Amino acid sequence: MQKWRYFWLNVVVIRLLTACGPSQAAELSMVTPPATPSEMMDTAAPNPAACPVTQPSASPFVPPPPYSPDAPYQGEFWYGTEVLWTLLSTDGTWRQLPQNKGVYTQKTFWWKKGYDWRTEPTPSLTVTGKRLDGSAPPLEASVATNGYHDDLKSFMLVGVDLPTAGCWEITGHSEGHDLSFVVWIEP
């Protein structure tokens, strides 16, 4: 048990330092054939101002207890509904993402009311994504895993690999419910 606590503490520390490492899951929830060089080319010039990133609303989402009504980290906000929510950057940008084999990697954290990491070690959650400002293969996502930290409570974690920078719509799918957001991936 002690070993698992250290493992999840490391996951949260990495998130705090915004130096998330590459996705470690061996399995992918989406099987995509390797992209050809022409598929990997950006067809649109990067224009972050034209990307409709998801911003905090005037009436922000407040998660149900036992979760804090305030996002656990400065510069981030809760986004979604009780059936599925996530934590997003207030400026809608993912910066300085590590690259692994030519793709940008990020870890996404998700929650849903009643989720317990101890009883659902492999959460019913998949993540998909598509680039909005140019052509690119879809993102690849790891199989969802579970986690717990005092600041975050029970959470679901999915690693994503994005083949290009640019404007991306990312969608979480869980038990018939979908939640989408738009983020700018800084090159």
Give the location of each predicted region.
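Contiguous segments within soluble domain cores/interaction surfaces
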Residues: L28-P163, C167-P187
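Bacterial signal peptide processing site
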Residues: G21-S23
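C-terminal motif of bacterial Sec signal peptides marking the signal peptidase cleavage site
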Residues: L16-A19
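Bacterial N-terminal signal peptides that target proteins for export
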Residues: M1-W8
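Sec-dependent N-terminal signal peptides
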Residues: W8-I14
